[in-house]
Design a protein with these regions (language model features):
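A flexible loop/linker signature enriched in serine peptidases of the S9 family
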Residues: 1-25, 35-41, 56-67, 72, ...
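A generic structural signal for ordered secondary structure
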Residues: 16-17, 31, 47, 65-67, ...
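Beta-strand initiation motifs
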Residues: 22-32, 73-82, 126-127
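Conserved blade-ending motifs and adjacent loop-strand segments that build the rim/top face
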Residues: 32-43, 76-100
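Short coil/turn segments that connect the beta-strands within blades of beta-propeller domains
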Residues: 49-51, 105
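Blade-level signature of beta-propeller repeat domains, shared across WD40, Kelch, NHL, RCC1
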Residues: 94-127
């Protein structure tokens, strides 16, 4: 799984998965797009069970944490991305690039604010 800017004139990036092949680089024609090229989607991480991808996106005007359910067989998106955690409002609105780590039942998020913050949120059932 990776992020890329497939259109050289685009300001946005999108998320892809590709079959693993250690012998040769995987041709872009074999990349499977998970998100569209309408937003800046970045920092993808698998959920522990492989059924979900968590990522940061500016799709609501702020850089927030989003998720996307995947088809367990094809690894294609199985629906629309949905917000997991918003970072709107002062001072969180000034967060540019949160970093995060996905655990079995929680996500730990590091925010770049005037003073560094470390957040931990429990994932609801089904996440």
């Amino acid at each position: 799984m990776f992020q890329a800017r497939p259109a050289p004139v685009s300001d946005f990036e999108q998320l892809f998965v590709a079959p693993a092949d250690e012998s040769v680089p995987v041709a872009p024609s074999r990349w499977i797009a998970l998100t569209d090229l309408q937003h800046f989607d970045a920092d993808p991480q698998w959920s522990r069970d492989g059924k979900m991808v968590y990522f940061t996106s500016n799709r609501d005007g702020y850089t927030c944490l989003w998720a996307l359910r995947l088809d367990s067989v094809t690894k294609r998106s199985a629906g629309q991305p949905f917000a997991v955690q918003h970072f709107h409002g002062t001072p969180r609105a000034h967060t540019l690039y949160p970093t995060f780590s996905v655990g079995p039942d929680r996500i730990v998020i590091s925010l770049d604010q005037l003073q560094s913050d470390l957040w931990m949120m429990h994932l609801p059932e089904g996440h």
